[in-house]
Regions:
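Intrinsically disordered, low-complexity terminal tails/loops enriched in metal-binding residues
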Residues: 6, 15-258
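Bacterial N-terminal signal peptides that target proteins for export
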Residues: 1-10
Length: 258
């Protein structure tokens, strides 16, 4: 009888120990579950302007024809692609790809560059200034040595460049209405807001419209360029078009006046 009772007690204890071991292992796995899930990668912050062109730098296709553009940021530099397959091709030889993009930006923004002086020193630019692209903006300096000074406060110098663009293009600005909404400047929306995109002044009627320009900068660059050449601008979307989408006064608007 004693032997039987000892056997039963031994079996019960063994069962309890086994159950405790299983529970401990299960808790251990739960504790490690969080470790298996890597934290979501943060999108690098963009510096300067959005990607200014309407086409993919790899395929040459119009952005948006294959769905929403794929956006990548390289050391603060934004590039947009037509599809998910193009970034790998661009990144295979990243420096060469960026250099090619720099050439395109310099060719595009060079003719409308507003300053004849170095952005850093304020001295007259030489016949062949030192040029580079920062944050998708063309920068001209008197000499390469000035680039180190620019790097200390790039936001400050970009703001100075923006002011120069507004000063150079503001007086003869070709549009009388906001290119996004079609609202006349200075109406119920108040004073217009001056944006600088890829070296162009883009004047909008309100803060809501800034986000539309940010979403598709090439579209509005094209509208301003066409108007400057005397061409009739394309039909604007209008504020009513944005109601219920992104904005202008809609009840479920994604953004409103700040």
């Amino acid at each position: 009888m004693t032997a039987t009772r000892l056997s039963v007690m031994t079996a019960v204890l063994a069962g309890l120990l086994s159950t405790g071991s299983v529970l401990a292992q299960h808790e251990g796995h739960e504790g490690h579950a969080g470790h298996d899930q890597a934290p979501a990668a943060k999108t690098p912050a963009r510096v300067g302007d959005a990607y200014p062109f309407a086409t993919c730098p790899i395929s040459g296709k119009q952005l948006g024809t294959m769905g929403d553009p794929v956006v990548k940021v390289y050391d603060g530099r934004e590039v947009r692609y037509c599809c998910g397959g193009c970034p790998k091709k661009f990144e295979k030889h990243l420096q060469q790809s960026l250099a090619k993009l720099d050439e395109k930006i310099a060719a595009d923004q060079g003719p409308i560059y507003p300053l004849k002086t170095s952005l850093v020193t304020g001295k007259d630019l030489p016949e062949k200034p030192f040029e580079f692209v920062y944050g998708n903006r063309l920068i001209r300096l008197g000499a390469e040595q000035e680039r180190a000074e620019f790097a200390k406060a790039p936001a400050k110098y970009l703001a100075t460049l923006d002011q120069a663009v507004v000063g150079a293009q503001g007086k003869g600005y070709p549009l009388k209405e906001c290119p996004v909404s079609g609202e006349k400047y200075g109406g119920d929306m108040g004073d217009p807001i001056d944006l600088v995109v890829a070296g162009r002044l883009v004047r909008v009627c309100c803060k809501d419209c800034k986000k539309d320009v940010e979403k598709d900068p090439a579209k509005f660059i094209g509208l301003v360029d066409a108007a400057r050449k005397g061409e009739k601008p394309a039909t604007h979307e209008g504020h009513e078009q944005h109601k219920g989408q992104e904005g202008h006064g809609g009840k479920d608007a994604g953004h409103g006046h700040e």
